[in-house]
């Protein structure tokens, strides 16, 4: 079978152009790479081999362990260079609230808040009330907070107290009397006195009063 002259002359030209293109590709690659070209009879793809080096990762300088012995024996790119730094300029470190139990008082959050606000208002109005021990213990910190706001006496603190206490007259009386009554006392403005259980459900009861 006779081969056309055009096909016979096209084969060397294509091979030359192919060799020229692969040579130009080899010259364009970095000097660190080794390129292996296949022979003219082989049709396997070109394999490119690059040197593999260990990753040069920067050392982590964030939340490092408090104990510097924990970083001994680690590679340079895994070791902690800086210790655990505590921010001095008013910074805070937050953690999870493990064990911080909130008294539920068998109420949803909105009803529980309203209950504590009402108990605080009644205690500041009458000076002494009788309730369950759980409620007395839960409302104690809110009563102390209102008295602390009244000791400050500023307009901002007064508005905060008006947003919590239900009766406006109690707030004005509180801000007028607290500085003279608790001016020298730092905390501990209430007292809880246990009493007999409630008749019917036997719930533990207590009196809570202002000191």
Swiss-Prot record:
Transit peptide per record: 1-95
GO BP annotations, alphabetical order: translation
Compartment annotation: Plastid, Chloroplast
Domain of life: Eukaryota
Short name of one Pfam family: Ribosomal_L17
InterPro entries the UniProt entry points to: Ribosomal_bL17, Ribosomal_bL17_sf
Keywords for the protein's UniProt record, in alphabetical order: Chloroplast, Plastid, Ribonucleoprotein, Ribosomal protein, RNA-binding, rRNA-binding, Transit peptide
Gene Ontology CC annotations of this record: chloroplast; chloroplast envelope; chloroplast stroma; cytosol; ribonucleoprotein complex; ribosome
Main localization, broad class: plastid
Gene Ontology terms, MF aspect: rRNA binding; structural constituent of ribosome
Membrane keyword on record: no
Subunit (UniProt): Part of the 50S ribosomal subunit.
Family: Belongs to the bacterial ribosomal protein bL17 family.
The protein's role, per its UniProt record: This protein binds directly to 23S ribosomal RNA.
Protein name: Large ribosomal subunit protein bL17c
């Amino acid at each position: 079978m006779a081969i056309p002259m055009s096909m016979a002359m096209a084969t060397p030209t294509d091979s030359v152009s192919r060799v020229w293109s692969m040579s130009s590709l080899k010259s364009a690659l970095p000097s660190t790479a080794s390129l292996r070209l296949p022979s003219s009879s082989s049709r396997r793809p070109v394999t490119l081999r690059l040197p593999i080096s260990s990753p040069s990762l920067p050392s982590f300088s964030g939340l490092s362990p408090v104990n510097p012995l924990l970083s001994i024996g680690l590679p340079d790119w895994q070791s902690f260079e800086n210790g655990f730094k505590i921010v001095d300029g008013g910074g805070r470190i937050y953690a999870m609230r493990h064990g911080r139990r909130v008294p539920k008082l068998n109420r949803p959050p909105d009803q529980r808040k309203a209950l504590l606000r009402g108990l605080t208002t009644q205690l500041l109005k009458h000076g002494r009330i009788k309730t369950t021990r759980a409620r007395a213990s839960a409302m104690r910190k809110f009563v102390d907070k209102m008295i602390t706001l009244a000791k400050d006496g500023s307009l901002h603190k007064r508005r905060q107290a008006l947003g919590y206490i239900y009766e406006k007259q109690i707030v004005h009386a509180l801000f007028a009397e607290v500085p003279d009554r608790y001016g020298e006392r730092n905390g501990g403005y209430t007292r809880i006195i246990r009493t007999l259980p409630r008749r019917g459900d036997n719930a533990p009861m207590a009196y809570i009063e202002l000191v």
